[in-house]
């Protein structure tokens, strides 16, 4: 029994704290140049502005400018009750699945995020992928009547 307790204590010490390598990496991130961070911030602002502009052109979407992270939450309830002839869209989860299957674009229904009338779209990707994704989404949504 005492061996188990000793091993348990030892294991806790090994796994409960960050390793020295990650501590050094964190120190370098905090004390080093912030230029890469500024470049990433500009890139995400550009992508945000691009996806907002393009999503506002999607008939049926209501779009607000995101204030944090890298997700857009367009309101999509306009499409609830609509169908492509094969499946009926009842909620944002149905719409996200439809967009995955028909447009091959991954979105997430907003219910899990407290926004059941929205879908969550990430813009943590290239400008080209954003443009192509919105093109595919528009094409898929146009099939819903």
Question: What positions do the PLM features span?
Answer:
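PLP-dependent class I/II
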Residues: 1-145
């Amino acid at each position: 029994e005492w061996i188990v307790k000793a091993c348990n204590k030892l294991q806790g010490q090994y796994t409960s704290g960050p390793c020295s390598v990650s501590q050094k990496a964190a120190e370098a991130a905090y004390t080093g140049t912030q230029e890469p961070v500024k470049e990433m911030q500009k890139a995400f602002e550009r992508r945000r502005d691009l996806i907002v502009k393009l999503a506002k052109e999607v008939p049926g979407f209501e779009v607000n400018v995101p204030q944090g992270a890298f997700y857009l939450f367009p309101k999509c309830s306009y499409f609830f009750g609509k169908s492509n002839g094969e499946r009926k869209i009842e909620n944002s989860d149905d719409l996200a699945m439809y967009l995955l299957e028909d447009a091959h674009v991954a979105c997430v229904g907003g219910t899990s995020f407290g926004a059941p009338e929205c879908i969550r779209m990430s813009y943590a990707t290239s400008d080209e992928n954003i443009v192509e994704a919105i093109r595919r989404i528009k094409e898929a949504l146009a099939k819903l009547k």
